[in-house]
Amino acid sequence: MDVEKEMHDMEENFSDMKPTFAIYGDVGVGKTTFTSYAPNSLLIDAEGGRASIAKTPNSPKILEPENLSDLGEIYLWLKANQDKFDSVIIDTLSEVEKWAVEESIQKAVKKDPTKDKDLATRSDYKKGGTKVGRVARMFRNLDMYTFFLLHERSDKDDSTGAVKLGPKVMPSVMSDLNGFTDIIFYIEVDDSGNRKIRTSPNRKIRAKHRIGELPNVIDLGTEFKDFRIDTVLEMINNS
């Protein structure tokens, strides 16, 4: 590392920092629509969720990888062409995790044909988690806004019985996300159809924000046209 060359002053505002987001919620709450309003974005559609943005006025560029190898090629292209986009969205990291575990299973089957190809072992999950963490770190290091979309899962504390919502990934990957993301948002829809962003943790929900001053809950109303990440980015930048 060239210390003199790499040393710099603290960024003056949020937009210069190009933070990393993890955004999670139940199926159908609008994660893809919400983040598709990110500035000059590339949507990496690993799950086939892009149809939801057809009714919106925005038009991110779209790539449809089928496996980790494709995702690696996309990363290398972005690294060499970081001036092409201001934002990259992986939809979803939960699906990428499935790819990683399946790849670990198939490699194990090649080594041992007697292994059940439909049964993931502890080793498969461990290797898959390591791969996903590596992929997430690579994209996090790009000079652009990075958004990891995830489904939600509930975890029960065996000692207290308490249930807490968080992103649907393995605990090892969740630990990575906690460490290197700047912002974790939870999207929910209440009984009236209001879409809300949880920005801070409580006893039942995992969330955080390291940058800017935000309310614990951002209410973006019932209209999809108002449910957009650029509104929240502006809130953070002006806080």
Predicted features, each with a name:
Residues M1-K5, S15, P19, S192-S239:
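C-terminal regions of RecA-like/P-loop NTPase motor modules
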Residues T92-D176:
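P-loop NTPase motor core
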Residues T146-D219:
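Phosphate-binding/switch region of NTP-binding enzymes
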